[in-house]
């Protein structure tokens, strides 16, 4: 597989930066929304947090791009004052690793299975961190339905957003020559 081009790296960084800003806005909306809707709100929005590595990997489909996009988004989110601190970096690295694994399994094809696996792996990887950090490794029965919602969001919210954004980027010509440009 060829190395990433300068254009691919720059586009990934720009996407990561924009998504990092979105994450920051969502972080501050999350506080009052979770108070009103409970912990399920985070699980419903999980797919949005999977956006940077998944969009980057869908567009370019080269090893390392998913983690790079995730780290850029996390750094921008952190620099803009995320209330979650350094945990943002860890969560995004885990999401990026999940997407990298999923796309490697499907041999870097941008098919629906890549999104399904990304959503499942991303939910599991980040839940493992949450389980240790936030739940003191104490299993509680409410975690099962939350995990199901997280997985579904990781698959469907991410899939819909990535497809919409990729379609818009194709129309601009920004992704001309990228792997996604060859898709129908």
Regions found by a protein language model. Give the residues of each.
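Membrane-helix interfacial "entry" motifs
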Residues: 1-4, 8, 38, 42, ...
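Hydrophobic transmembrane alpha-helices
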Residues: 2-56
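Hydrophobic alpha-helical transmembrane segments
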Residues: 9-14, 47, 51, 63-71, ...
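Short helix-perturbing small/polar motifs within transmembrane alpha-helices
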Residues: 11, 21, 90-130
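Aromatic-anchored segments of alpha-helical transmembrane domains
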Residues: 16-24, 71-80, 119-130
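Interfacial aromatic-anchored transmembrane helix boundaries in multi-pass membrane proteins
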Residues: 31-34, 73-101, 130-134
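Membrane-embedded alpha-helical hairpins and interfacial helices in multi-pass inner-membrane proteins
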Residues: 38, 108-184
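Generic transmembrane alpha-helix motif of multi-pass integral membrane proteins
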Residues: 46-61, 98-106
């Amino acid at each position: 597989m060829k190395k990433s081009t300068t254009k691919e790296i720059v586009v990934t960084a720009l996407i990561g930066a924009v998504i990092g800003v979105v994450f920051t806005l969502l972080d501050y909306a999350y506080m009052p929304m979770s108070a009103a809707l409970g912990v399920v709100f985070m699980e419903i929005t999980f797919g949005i947090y999977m956006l940077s590595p998944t969009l980057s990997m869908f567009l370019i489909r080269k090893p390392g791009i998913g983690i790079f996009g995730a780290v850029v988004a996390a750094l921008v989110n952190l620099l803009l004052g995320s209330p979650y601190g350094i945990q943002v970096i860890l969560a995004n690295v885990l999401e990026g690793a999940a997407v990298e694994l999923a796309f490697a399994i499907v041999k870097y094809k941008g098919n629906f299975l890549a999104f399904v696996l990304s959503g499942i792996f991303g939910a599991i990887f980040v839940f493992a961190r949450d389980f240790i950090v936030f739940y003191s490794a104490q299993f509680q029965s409410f975690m099962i339905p939350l995990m199901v919602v997280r997985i579904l969001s990781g698959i469907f919210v991410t899939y819909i957003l990535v497809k919409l954004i990729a379609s818009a980027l194709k129309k601009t010509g920004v992704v001309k020559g990228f792997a996604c440009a060859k898709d129908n």
